[in-house]
Amino acid sequence: MCSPEEAALLRLEEVFSATLARINSLVFQPLLEAGPEASDPWGRECLQLLQQLHSSSQQLWDVMEESLHSLRERLRRPEAVGLESLLLLQSADRVLQVHLEYIESYTCCVAVQAFQKAVKRRSEYWRGQRKALRQVLSGLSSEGSVGTALLQALRQPLAHHVQQYVLLLLSLGDTVGECHPTRELVIHAASLFGDLQSFMRQELDQATATQALWPTLSSRLRDVLCTPARRLLQDSQDVPVTVTPLRAERVLLFDDALVLLQGHNIHTFDLKLVWVEPGQDRCTFHLLTPEEGFSFCSKDPQGLVVWQWKVTQAVCQALRGKKDFPVLGAGLEPSEPPTCRCGAYTFHAEGRFCQATYEGEWYWGRPHGKGTLKWPDGRNHVGDFCQGLEHGFGIRLVPQASEDKFDCYKCHWWEGSMCGYGICEYSTSEVYKGYFQEGLRHGFGVLESAPQAPRPLRYTGHWERGQRSGYGVEEDSDRGERYIGMWQADQRHGPGVMVTQAGVCYQGTFQADKMVGPGILLSDDDSLYEGTFTRDLTLVGKGKVTFPNGFTLEGSFGSVSGRGLHTQGVLDTAALPPDPSSTCKRQLGQGVFPVESRWQGVYGAFRDFVRAGCPGDLREALLGFHVQSSRELRKSQEYLCCERTCPEDQAGRMEDLLEELLQHREPEALQQCLRKALSNSLHPLGKLLRTLMLTFQATYAGIGANKHLQGLAQEEVKQHAQELWAAYRGLLQVALQRKGQAPEEDEDAETRDLRVHSLVLPLVLPSFYSELFTLYLLLHEREDSLYSQGITHLSLFPDARLLEFLDVQKHLWPLKDLTLTTNQRYSLVRDKCFLSATECLQKMITTVDPREKLEVLERTYGEIEATVSRVLGREHKLPMDDLLPLLIYVVSRAQIQHLGAEIHLIRDMMDPLHTGGLYDFLLTALESCYEHIQKEDMRLHRLPSRWSSREPW
């Protein structure tokens, strides 16, 4: 059985559906048929509002028909169709929504008097429709305007229908009982439609108040402020309030904006960007907007409370983006607006942001968090903001005069200016990667022009207030030159070394980009000039030339146009050949550029990071970041995306990295920890190492691969290892400090050098090895060439003949190790004696670690002694006289290329702790073998013309 309430609901829906049908034919069709004049914009807008209202009415009618159908099914088959099947219960929210949409459309028409304006176009027709309208409305008087009658016709049936909904649903809830499974649905629906009644009353009141406002304003103000969706919430003419410092004549609070009227001026503030701050007393409260702040005052505390409450709730409602339901300030959402919010605003006050539109996060009236700035001239900035200024990482795009050309700055910002690390791609195709301060290049940085530029340049070094200053390296690819030295005010200034692609290099003092005073000029044939000369290498003034053969020419030099170089001086042909160290191996730059002061911009940024306590938010700004960069022309919006590696995700949080250092302090564990850190390009130590690698390659690779720079390079590698150890110590001290533990004591120089050579240098040397070893190769090219000739010659000897040639005592020959095949004699066997020692020595070139190379040499020595002991059948320690010939034999058979470069690199880079020890002894022995093989008798000794076939080998 169905309840009486369900039957009443059915009758209610039938009546309302029929009423909607009559309204459609009686009201909507005539209204929509009367089109506005073409010159009447307000008429066209009213027509659109009426069309929207008609559409909402149709949707409401359709839902009523569905509800009616569900009720009929329920009453026709009560046993089969449950109460929960009623549309009014199972889809109460949907039914509510169509009512809300109808109310919204209706109140928009009310707010702008759309009905009154539409009626005017067919006033005679509507006056004749009063009788028909009485069929729809109860209590319609014969007096009053037709517009008012239409308002009632479109509102009264709905209000009555919702009222009956509530009464019948409440009654139905009582009928079904508390235990009925559908009771909650019934109560929920009754509550919704009860709230809808309150919402409808509020909306009608606001629309009526808004409609009454417009006639009180001038036509100019009305044109600016009047929109169908806008509702008036409060007017200072109703509740007086004073606004300072603007002294507004009238204050209007709408549901989307706060409007202050001051004479002919209109000040409009988007409520989404209005912050309410209570005052110190009951007579004042403050409003904060992106560019202005106001105080609201009133002599009536109660009136001020009304204003403060309504502004606060209006801001909350605007931020939520939908009207509060059922009334303003109601609902489950917080009644206080959040201090952090998102919004868009165009700045108008004079300043850097003038005419710029900011869209993003705000905090108390200031851009704060992530956001985007766009200027009318095409400039864009995307990034982090703090208290109204660019602060943190940001990308700035600046258009240039040329079409589709932009300067793109991917940088860290501090209080509105670039500060910290950044990558800038200019419209000229230049790219700068380095540090900034107050918007200017400052600290370490690399500026590189495009390869196709008229004059391709690359500068790697230090900057000061936008200019090259301090130590730096510039490569001029067009001239084939590389300058290594000091700069000031964007010019070469101070000591410097110039290296050319042709192999010529010189050292001197520069002033304002010009060389002044005497210098040193080394040519590719090892001629040496000491004196004054010009940038184009023309000898002028007094000087001395030392030729490779030892001849010297000392005097005055000059040049005459068309006649070349001329000189007046003394040519000394009796001089002895010069010491190789004074010409061929002359090193430039040492002592002129103290190694500890060359790359302070790189070390300094890391020290600043440590001094600041290794904060995560400064990690990128001080240590740099990596982005994918391309020189290809891209659309402007694509520049605003930075595929920046996120350090927190890929390298771990700073706290985790510091914790790892604390857990690995024992020597063996520490080396593994350092290896892991240095191999990770996102770890602070790994970042520092890669920046140092960049400076090293910029100085010594390519054109810089000159033998006269080997001394500079090898001391630089040692310094980098020392600085990396200091960097590790700095991180460790921060880790201890964060844990509240006592810091480690300062190291003395001896302990520090021991740790650097044993722990750090073996780990960092591979990163610099390619460029460094190339310099050693060039420096020892002549000796290595002689050595190569020697081992090539010695390789022609069979084993027995070579042992004899090297005066190895016969009782030490390991002939019993040889296994002869048929028709083979001992005298013809080759590369079999001391094979284990030879293979061991060959492993020297498989590692770059000096200590591991020395360990290979030690094992080689052990293999030689083990072979001799096996031959003699007893333990035997080789004296130096016996060791050297055997070692020469092993070296000649190992055929290690560039052994001289290997030996000198090992000696320069080995731990000073080994000086005077076994490793030093063995390295000296190897060096003696190397020098012996270079001798003329080793290189040019002729083999016997025939071999005796009867020799008993």
From Swiss-Prot:
Single GO cellular component term: cytoplasmic vesicle
GO process annotations (BP): endosomal transport
GO molecular function, one term: guanyl-nucleotide exchange factor activity
Transmembrane segments: none
Cytoplasm as UniProt keyword: yes
Keyword field: Cytoplasm, GTPase activation, Repeat
Compartment list: Cytoplasm
Alphabetized PANTHER family for the sequence: ALS2 C-TERMINAL-LIKE PROTEIN, ALSIN HOMOLOG
Organism of this sequence: Bos taurus (Bovine)
Protein name (Swiss-Prot/TrEMBL): ALS2 C-terminal-like protein
Residue span, VPS9 domain: 796-942
Subunit structure as annotated in this protein's UniProt entry: Homodimer. Forms a heteromeric complex with ALS2. Interacts with ALS2 and RAB5A.
MORN repeats: 358-380, 381-403, 409-431, 432-454, 459-481, 483-505, 506-528, 529-552
Gene designation per UniProt: ALS2CL
Keyword Cytoplasm belongs to the record: yes
Biological role stated in the UniProt entry: Acts as a guanine nucleotide exchange factor (GEF) for Rab5 GTPase. Regulates the ALS2-mediated endosome dynamics.
